[in-house]
């Protein structure tokens, strides 16, 4: 085994040991349930002033009737 190969082996070994010790320290803990729900809701909810068929799909959690550009009343997220 020459010097370059030995250096590469030591580098890989140090990386593996570093990953294992980081895992033992809790660096890879999963999200709490509430955090996961908040992230999911943010990625799937309807933003403000967008049409909303259901109140629960809005990021704010509520819809109201508002006039659109044609003067018609449509439900939009608050």
Swiss-Prot record:
Keywords: Calcium channel impairing toxin, Cleavage on pair of basic residues, Disulfide bond, Ion channel impairing toxin, Knottin, Secreted, Signal, Toxin, Voltage-gated calcium channel impairing toxin. GO terms for cellular component: extracellular region. Residues 23-40 form a propeptide. InterPro entries: Omega-atracotox. It is found in: Secreted. One of its GO terms (molecular function) is calcium channel inhibitor activity. Expressed by the venom gland. The record marks 51, 68, 76 as: Critical for insecticidal activity. Residues 1-22 form the signal peptide. Disulfide bonds join 45-59, 52-63, 58-77. GO terms for biological process: defense response. The presence of a 'disulfide through disulfide knot' structurally defines this protein as a knottin. Inhibits insect, but not mammalian, voltage-gated calcium channels (Cav). Several paralogs that code for the same precursor are shown in this entry, whereas other paralogs are shown in AC S0F1N4 and AC S0F1M8. Belongs to the neurotoxin 08 (Shiva) family. 01 (omega toxin) subfamily. This is Omega-hexatoxin-Hi1g.
């Amino acid at each position: 085994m020459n010097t370059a190969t030995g250096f590469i082996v030591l580098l890989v070994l140090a990386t593996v040991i570093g990953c294992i010790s980081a895992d033992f320290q809790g660096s890879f803990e999963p999200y709490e349930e509430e955090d996961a729900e908040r992230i999911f809701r943010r990625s799937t909810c309807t933003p403000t002033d967008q049409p909303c068929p259901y109140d629960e799909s809005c990021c704010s959690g509520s819809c109201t009737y508002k006039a659109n550009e044609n003067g018609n009343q449509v439900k939009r997220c608050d």
